[in-house]
Amino acid sequence: MASLSEKYRPRHFAGVVGQAKAVKQVQAVLARGWGGRAWWISGASGTGKTTIANLIADAGADPFFVEELDAQVLTPAKLAEVERSFAYRAMSGRPGKAYLVNEAHGLRKDAIRLLLVMLERLPEHVCIVFTTTNAGELLFSDEGDAAPLISRCTQIKLENGPSSRKAMAIRAQKIARDQKIDGFDDAVYADAVDQCRGNLRMLLSRIESGAFVEDATQRRTWRTELAAMPVETKANAKRRRELAELLDAA
């Protein structure tokens, strides 16, 4: 059985959560052509990098012609193999070939040098999408300047701010209700997204495991106790501090 994050993974750009600006940028670029292009998608874990990368790939390539690679295995020999595979393409349907490179900040120095050349001559039916949790020009441990590589890519930076997290909370609440896990108000889901640092995948995992319900129920108990606490006394003040610390730490 698929995890909740896979079961509810968006199948269209309209379903991507909390990344309206990034989706608009991607769609504008795709409208000018799919192939012969590399993408660099950066953002925190669980914000939608893999989803957007898959949607980009799906826009021009059939699933059989989408290959997922880990950056750390991209040796010169592997890159040569990838480049040779450009020659093979679908004869019907979507004719493109897509390569999704995960954890791109793990690229090796020798791979980066080859990629600088490869990206300059990508065939029109080929698309490469790099994803990384790191951003900026100092992201390779053994290759300080990332600018030469990133400048050859269409750069998409995913958000993890208040508006993005609000959209994630709304989506998580809807999914929880679909799964018959209800009874919590909007604020509980907003808190849960913040506890997961804007990682929707992590929150869905907690919903699936039951940890979300346990935590949300406990937090509701603490809030109820705090709200019902009588006139301030020395003992009450101590308990208020304890409850506030528990709510902040949970």
Task: Show the residue positions of the predicted features.
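A generic, residue-level signal for flexible/boundary positions that often mark functional hotspots
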Residues: A2, K7-R11, P63, V101, ...
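C-terminal engagement/docking regions of AAA+ P-loop ATPases
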Residues: E225-A250
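Short, solvent-exposed coil/turn linker segments
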Residues: R11-H12, D62, D70, Q218
